[in-house]
Amino acid sequence: GGRIPVKILLEKDLPGCPAEAFYETDGMLSVEAEHFICNEKADAGAFYVLPEYGKTLSGVKAYPQTKTFFEMAEQIRQAPKLTYQIYVREAGEYEMICYTAPANPVCQGGSVYFGCAVNGNAPQKIEMIPDGYRSGEPSCAEWAKMVVDQIRVVRVQVTLQSGENEIGIYAGTPGFLLEKLTFVRKGKHLPESGLGLPERRRTNR
């Protein structure tokens, strides 16, 4: 039989990288939704893992599923929260790409959103529906792509520090269901892929 070469990436130098953290390679990293380090319940509800949901591993969604957990930015900290731990070599601007269920607002012009905080800073309200979006209309390119791909992609600009970072994701409207987070350093290009960038996790083995 023939031989098939297989390349295995080994990271030897990860100073200060916590055990089990997800780490960056060539300016990019991914984390599956269920791989949070902390799941903080709120008085109004909590996040739950939906096994085998979506394109890769699973999804996470807050319940009660009809609940809107906040409306104003100053209310975000009252919502259920997931915390993710990531490690990057270089401080700077990164694009956080959120892969979510293909949710539509309940009415035209409506809103679907969640909250995000980086390293304990003030959380921001992240709107998932772009201006001019019209669900159910073939002339709306954003809607048509979401239907074909069966996923919604939301891009958020974040500032990360060198080394360990904590990303907080807060429940918002009922339509928010997270499948994966990907981070891409400014100036880097994420290759096109149907399943997205695979995650890399440090182990002690």
Language-model features: where?
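Extracytoplasmic
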Residues: G1-R205
